[in-house]
């Protein structure tokens, strides 16, 4: 009976010590309570998202993305999924556009990202479906329209942006 009590005491003591170590490792580093500034910022974001202005802005973001995508396609660029229904456009720069003189195939996503950045257009290198290249130097680039729409750009502006992208990549 004494041996069993010692084991129970030893186990209980070990479990208590282990619990303290786990609690110390998790809180406050990994867990914590909500912060008032975070709660307030979520409240403001939800309020703004419910306004007519934000709904109009969101619609304009998608319109701009569609114009960007359509203009790239008209220039022979291979847009993944042949268009967009969101704020993003995914472009294959490795295989490029093969249906027109604007073809710029053979650029990696990393090269295209740098070329466009050097010309004042910020995009992200991005893998594309069935990409055979590394995620660090993929075949595609991802274009978004939210930032420029926030600055007041419209469909006409995005048509010009698309043409500029094609010219930059074609002349690389």
What label would you give each PLM region?
Residues 1-99, 105-108:
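Active-site C-terminal subdomain of aminotransferase-like
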Residues 63, 99-101, 135-172:
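PLP-dependent enzyme catalytic core of the Aspartate aminotransferase-like
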Residues 100-120, 152-154:
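Helical (often loop-to-helix) elements that flank the catalytic cores of nucleotide-handling enzymes
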Residues 67, 71-75, 111-119, 168:
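Generic non-transmembrane alpha-helical segments
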Residues 118-142:
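Conserved PLP cofactor-binding pocket of PLP-dependent enzymes
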Residues 81-84, 115-117, 134-138, 153:
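A structural signal for short secondary-structure junctions
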């Amino acid at each position: 009976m004494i041996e069993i009590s010692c084991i129970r005491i030893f186990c209980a003591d070990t479990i208590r010590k282990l619990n303290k170590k786990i609690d110390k490792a998790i809180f406050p580093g990994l867990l914590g309570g909500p912060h008032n500034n975070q709660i307030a910022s979520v409240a403001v974001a939800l309020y703004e998202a419910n306004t007519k202005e934000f709904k109009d802005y969101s619609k304009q973001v998608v319109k701009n993305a569609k114009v960007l995508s359509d203009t790239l396609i008209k220039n022979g660029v291979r847009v993944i999924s042949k268009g967009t229904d969101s704020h993003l456009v995914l472009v294959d720069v490795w295989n490029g556009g093969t249906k027109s003189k604007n073809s710029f195939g053979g650029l990696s996503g990393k090269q295209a990202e740098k070329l466009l950045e050097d010309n004042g257009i910020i995009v992200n290198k991005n893998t594309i479906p069935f990409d055979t290249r590394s995620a660090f130097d993929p075949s595609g680039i991802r274009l978004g329209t939210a930032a420029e729409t926030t600055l007041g750009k419209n469909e006409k502006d995005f048509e010009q942006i698309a043409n500029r992208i094609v010219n930059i990549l074609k002349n690389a």
